[in-house]
Structures are given as structure tokens and as C-alpha cells.
């Protein structure tokens, strides 16, 4: 690995430990020429997930889009950044475990909604209102009734 300071190609690993719940390895390196220490992360390169949108368009799965939607839905709610990140990780892991390289955007939205329903009902309703694009208030009220019915079953 090339030193970011002097560009010398020889470095040695000083320390190595798991990071990101074991999904990557954090390494402290030291340049053999100038002695500069820096950190690198090693992660398995995964094949891209392709999201098939409702109009048939295809784009690469973007964790950041899922995270932004969750942050917006959870604004001013008692949901931590760690909980949001855990949902993003779980959704991506579940999508990859399907084993298909192309995933319908509907499936992503449904998985996120299911996670939110178990975490925070207000955030769930916020996310659902944007994701499902309710045409009028009656559809929105129906969704609330369904949520209340599910709560009775718990």
C-alpha cells in the first residue's frame, strides 16, 4: 500500500482488528520509509445490487438513499443513528441473501416499512405516506387502522 505522505510503496501492518461488526478489517499501517502511520479498511467487494424501479429503470442500490429516507421519517423521533444504520444493514443483508442481482424497488420499501413498524410507529407512518404515495386521506386512514389492528395482535 502506498504511503499517503511520501508515496513510498512499502508499508507494514502495525495493528489489525475487526470493524463494522466483523464486515471489515481495520489496519494501522506504518510507512517503511518515512514512518508515517495511517489507517486503512479492508472489506469484501460485493457484486452490485441493481434496483428495478416501477417505471422499469435500473440503478445501482444506494445505501445512502435508504438512510436518507429513514432519517427523514425518524426526524424528531426517539430513534438513534445506530438504529437507523442497523436497519440499513439489515435491509441490505436481506436483499443480498435473496441471491438475485436485480431487486424490485417495492421490495426495498416494504422491508424498510416492516423494520420501522417494529421500531417507531410514527416514523413508519411518515415513511409509508411518502413511499406509498397515498392518493387521499381515506387511504391514509386505512393504513393507520391496519397499523392499530397489528398493535392489538401484539
Swiss-Prot record:
GO terms for biological process: negative regulation of DNA-templated transcription. InterPro entries: ATP-cone_dom (IPR005144), NrdR-like_N (IPR055173), RNR_NrdR-like (IPR003796). The keyword Nucleotide-binding applies. Keywords: ATP-binding, DNA-binding, Metal-binding, Nucleotide-binding, Repressor, Transcription, Transcription regulation, Zinc, Zinc-finger. GO terms for molecular function: ATP binding; double-stranded DNA binding; zinc ion binding. The keyword Transcription regulation applies. Binds 1 zinc ion. A zinc finger (unnamed) spans 3-34. Residues 49-139 form the ATP-cone domain. PANTHER family: TRANSCRIPTIONAL REPRESSOR NRDR. Belongs to the NrdR family. NCBIfam families: transcriptional regulator NrdR. Negatively regulates transcription of bacterial ribonucleotide reductase nrd genes and operons by binding to NrdR-boxes. This is Transcriptional repressor NrdR. It comes from Listeria monocytogenes serovar 1/2a (strain ATCC BAA-679 / EGD-e).
